[in-house]
């Protein structure tokens, strides 16, 4: 456990945050490179301080597979679980078991398994039907038309897109549901296209792959670390929203325009809370100006669900009522994020409304509370809950976070960055 405390500055300050490399871009480029049979980078080649645990888990899983391991464990990484399911179905050297943590085994994977089976994959459930762990025997996939339910995760579609180097014939994918987190799927399509493989969206929800012989050169591993993570940047934006007018924060390696979907929404949403974005070469400067928001902030967050925790912290911290829709699939993340956001903000005297597909708040902080001891936040092993709630230190003065190491999943140096403003001590 750690305790955070803030002097709650009243004058503008200047911050400089080092963000981790883009987790979503790194994961896709690693898997695509592996499926093309290219040499994988070593863990030593990546910065251990900045490389998200998700990426380390994925890279270790790919390396284990190439070494002929019969058991692949991806830990907490949902990204690795979904991408490795597709990868192992065609590229494993021997039949193997794919597993993770207990929470990982509660996260559904049936839509992806069903789609892969329709392509000829041999995947069996070891425990509960529709959930990991899995037993996968590699097969050559064949041409077919695939129906895919993507209501819970766009990574099901991304996993299929990444298989392009191993598809020898035309494949049609038809979506049977609205696409959750759609920018991530289009990012995958763009990454695959960079390597010379083209998925065409011939009509809404209908994607076609036609093999071609003209593909790009081997992957450039320097691209893995070239661009900072926009989801991680949301915590810097949210923090600046809670600080005095004139506060600024420099974010090196954050790029606009970017393939990362969150880059399209975060600056727009945070501008309504008075955080403005200034673009310069190889860095972005954000600064605190006047708020532009109205009485209530409303948004469909289905394209950018990873922004929800930080955005909720910023909105509550600024006292702005909100209604965020299109987020029912957050219930099957590292935690049930809707319920956990509700329970942990309640410890700060904030009563969030929780629907099946939405989160809302009337902007009422209730009666002022005298906190005799700092609230203790339980992130429920969810990195984004820990990072978002920690920001509320700026409002309550002192806060304790259980299991702080959970942030390593996406932002290993988060406490180092936050320590540039808050005092942080282990307990």
Summary of predicted features, one role per range:
Residues 1-427:
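Short, structured segments at the rim of ligand-binding sites
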């Amino acid at each position: 456990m750690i305790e955070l405390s803030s002097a709650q500055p009243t004058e503008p300050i200047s911050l400089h945050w080092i963000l981790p490399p883009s987790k979503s871009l790194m994961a896709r480029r690693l898997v695509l490179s592996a499926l093309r049979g290219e040499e994988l980078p070593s863990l030593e080649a990546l910065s251990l301080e900045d490389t998200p645990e998700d990426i380390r888990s994925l890279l270790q899983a790919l390396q284990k597979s190439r070494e002929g391991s019969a058991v692949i464990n991806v830990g907490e990484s949902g990204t690795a679980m979904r991408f490795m399911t597709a990868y192992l179905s065609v590229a494993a050297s021997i039949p193997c078991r794919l597993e993770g943590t207990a929470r990982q085994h509660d996260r559904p994977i049936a839509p992806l398994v069903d789609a892969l089976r329709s392509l000829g994959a041999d995947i069996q459930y070891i425990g509960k039907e529709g959930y990991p762990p899995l037993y996968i025997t590699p097969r050559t996939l064949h041409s077919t038309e695939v129906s895919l339910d993507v209501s819970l995760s766009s990574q099901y579609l991304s996993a299929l897109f990444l298989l392009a180097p191993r598809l020898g014939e035309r494949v049609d994918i038809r979506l049977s549901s609205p696409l959750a987190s759609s920018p991530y799927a289009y990012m995958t399509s763009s990454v695959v296209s960079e390597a010379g493989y083209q998925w065409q969206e011939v009509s809404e929800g209908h994607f076609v792959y036609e093999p071609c012989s003209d593909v790009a050169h081997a992957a450039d591993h320097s691209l893995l670390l070239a661009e900072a993570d926009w989801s991680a940047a949301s915590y810097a934006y949210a923090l600046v929203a809670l600080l005095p007018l004139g506060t600024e924060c420099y974010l090196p390696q954050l790029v606009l325009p970017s393939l990362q979907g969150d880059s399209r929404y975060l600056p727009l949403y945070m501008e309504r809370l008075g955080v403005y974005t200034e673009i310069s070469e190889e860095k972005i400067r954000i600064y605190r100006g006047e708020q532009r928001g109205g009485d209530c902030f409303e948004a469909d967050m289905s394209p950018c669900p990873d922004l929800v925790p930080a955005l909720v912290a910023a909105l509550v911290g600024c006292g702005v009522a909100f209604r965020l829709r299109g987020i029912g699939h957050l219930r099957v993340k590292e935690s049930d994020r809707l319920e956990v956001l509700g329970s942990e903000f309640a410890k700060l005297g904030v009563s969030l409304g929780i629907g099946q597909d939405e989160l809302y708040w009337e902007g009422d902080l209730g009666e002022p509370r005298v906190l005799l001891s700092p609230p203790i936040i339980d992130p429920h092993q969810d990195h984004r809950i820990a990072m978002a709630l920690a920001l509320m230190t700026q409002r309550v003065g002192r806060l304790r976070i259980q299991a702080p190491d959970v942030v390593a999943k996406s932002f290993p140096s988060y406490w180092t960055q936050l320590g540039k403003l808050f005092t942080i001590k282990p307990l």
